């Protein structure tokens, strides 16, 4: 016999409580939840408002970043809400921070559109960061399952392919950013590129805010830059390049500029992080289809990545960008002018380069994660570095990195070409010493001094910048308790 409307409503009311119910009670907190291999996992640093229970705050993050709204709704009965609710399954107090908590949250894979960074982030960071019950919130780490990773293309080239193109193995790539950032004419800009490449660099690059300003329109820049690249390649017999920034106001214009870069012979283009995740993925697809290397400048990242209690940790950006398919990304120098704790920066580099991540709490890596054969993204070290730091750069950053000396090349008293030569000789000397088995880290200053005996430009660099360092306390360091078994 068919049930009446009144009877059906009575049964629904019996199994469904209306009104405002605590998130933890609604199912967004489940300490017994068994994490599935297919779950997307997120670790948040939660700072509840005074008087807010940390478990309820963590459940609220899970709810507001998945299926919840501020009150119970009837439509939940029309979905598999028990499946689609994100589950906060573990809450730990942050060591030495009594008002902060690490909240581990699991998301069912079906909550996310395949191959879309925009959709992934719309849930994970879309609305919850403005939640009033939280004083602050930071996304510290994520685990992306293999099934979801396989819906992304990843980098088109990666380290191995780029080395094969340049015929350069066993040492870092060497480059420089054209300075000043703004104001040069196209012809002078091209001359800077030529001088740097002629002096021994592999690449030069545009800076993040060089697009198409009145003093230098993009098409003229591209033509003069490629003239410099071709002349330097012919003079040195080496494969050279320059990162041409195609960032623009619209996707149509970026495609237009990228096509022009390819037409004039460039092997690499550049974009800025500020263009957004969808635009980044779109340009990555274009670069793959057109056999171009894609360099990403992380312009704007410190607005949300630097502060320890609120925003997004840069290691998460590294994961998203490797998924999106960029071939290069700026990832810190340790010794330069920009933010970068040595151990945390190592975690960034490992995230970009390793085929599989293990838990490493000092580096801020909270999850194991297999990269499902996605190619590596090459880290770029840029900002306040010079030849006298070469041994430290090799120690901290290894071989698979692009070392970008902007002021450390163009600020040389004897000219741009001399600055480039100084950096090239310094790099070759330190790499040779390492390969010969010398203690290149502790002997680094002596090794550079020996090399400078036969290289005047290097001696000038060492004399000029010998006292320059940026020794400031990092604002972002790892939070963990050292134990014999819990840390790597």
Swiss-Prot record:
Q: Which PROSITE patterns match?
A: RUBISCO_LARGE
What InterPro entries does this protein map onto? RuBisCO, RuBisCo_large_chain_AS, RuBisCO_lsu_C, RuBisCO_lsu_C_sf, RuBisCO_lsu_fd_N, RuBisCO_lsu_N_sf, RuBisCO_lsuI
Q: Which domain of life is it from?
A: Eukaryota
Q: Which residues form the signal peptide?
A: none
Keyword Plastid carried by entry:
yes
Record PTM N6-carboxylysine, positions in chain: 205
Site residues (Transition state stabilizer), renumbered to this chain: 337
List the GO biological process terms.
reductive pentose-phosphate cycle
Which sites are catalytic? 179, 297
Keyword Repressor on entry: no
Broad class of the protein's primary localization: plastid
Record's catalysed reaction(s) = 2 (2R)-3-phosphoglycerate + 2 H(+) = D-ribulose 1,5-bisphosphate + CO2 + H2O; D-ribulose 1,5-bisphosphate + O2 = 2-phosphoglycolate + (2R)-3-phosphoglycerate + 2 H(+)
The record's family statement is:
Belongs to the RuBisCO large chain family. Type I subfamily.
Role according to the record: RuBisCO catalyzes two reactions: the carboxylation of D-ribulose 1,5-bisphosphate, the primary event in carbon dioxide fixation, as well as the oxidative fragmentation of the pentose substrate in the photorespiration process. Both reactions occur simultaneously and in competition at the same active site.
Name of the molecule in the record: Ribulose bisphosphate carboxylase large chain
Organism for this UniProt entry: Cyanidium caldarium (Red alga)
GN (gene name): rbcL
């Amino acid at each position: 016999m068919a049930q009446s409307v009144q009877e059906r409503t009575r049964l629904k009311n019996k199994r469904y409580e209306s009104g405002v119910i605590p998130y933890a009670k609604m199912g967004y907190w489940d300490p017994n939840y068994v994490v599935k291999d297919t779950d997307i996992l997120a670790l948040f640093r939660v700072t509840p408002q005074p008087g807010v229970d940390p478990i309820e705050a963590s459940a609220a993050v899970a709810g507001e970043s998945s299926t919840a709204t501020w009150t119970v709704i009837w439509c939940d009965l029309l979905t598999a809400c028990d499946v689609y609710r994100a589950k906060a399954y573990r809450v730990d107090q942050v060591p030495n921070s009594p008002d902060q908590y690490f909240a581990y949250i699991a998301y069912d894979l079906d909550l996310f559109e395949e191959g879309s960074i925009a959709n992934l982030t719309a849930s994970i960071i879309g609305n919850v960061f403005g939640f009033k019950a939280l004083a602050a919130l930071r996304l510290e780490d994520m685990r992306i399952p293999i099934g979801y990773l396989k819906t992304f293309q990843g980098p088109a080239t990666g380290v191995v392919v780029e080395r094969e193109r340049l015929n350069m193995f066993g040492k870092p790539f060497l480059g420089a950013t054209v300075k000043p950032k703004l104001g040069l004419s196209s012809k002078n800009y091209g001359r800077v590129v030529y001088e740097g490449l002629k002096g021994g660099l592999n690449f030069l690059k545009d800076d993040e805010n060089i697009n198409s300003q009145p003093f230098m329109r993009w098409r003229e820049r591209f033509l003069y830059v490629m003239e410099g690249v071709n002349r330097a390649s012919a003079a040195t017999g080496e494969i050279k390049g320059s990162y041409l920034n195609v960032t623009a106001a619209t996707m149509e214009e970026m495609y237009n500029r990228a096509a022009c870069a390819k037409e004039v012979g460039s092997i690499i283009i550049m974009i800025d992080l500020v263009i957004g995740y969808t635009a980044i993925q779109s340009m990555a697809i274009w670069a793959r289809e057109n056999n171009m290397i894609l360099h990403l400048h992380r312009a704007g990242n410190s607005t949300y990545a630097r502060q320890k209690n609120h925003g997004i940790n840069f290691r998460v950006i590294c994961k998203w960008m490797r998924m999106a398919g960029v071939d290069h990304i700026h990832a810190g120098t340790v010794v330069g002018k920009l933010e970068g704790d040595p151990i945390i920066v190592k975690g960034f580099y490992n995230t970009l380069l390793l085929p599989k991540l293990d838990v490493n709490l000092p580096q801020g890596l909270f999850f194991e994660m297999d990269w499902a054969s996605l190619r590596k993204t090459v880290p770029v070290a840029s900002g306040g570095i010079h030849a006298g730091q070469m041994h430290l750069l090799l120690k901290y950053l290894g071989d698979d990195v692009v070392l970008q000396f902007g002021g450390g090349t163009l600020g040389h008293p004897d000219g741009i070409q001399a600055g480039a030569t100084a950096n090239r000789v310094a790099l070759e000397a330190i790499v040779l010493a390492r390969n010969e088995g010398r203690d290149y880290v502790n002997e680094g200053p002596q090794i550079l001094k020996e090399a400078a005996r036969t290289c005047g430009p290097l001696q000038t660099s060492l004399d000029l910048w010998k006292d320059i360092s940026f020794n400031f306390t990092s604002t972002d360091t790892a939070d963990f308790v050292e134990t014999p078994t819990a840390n790597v």
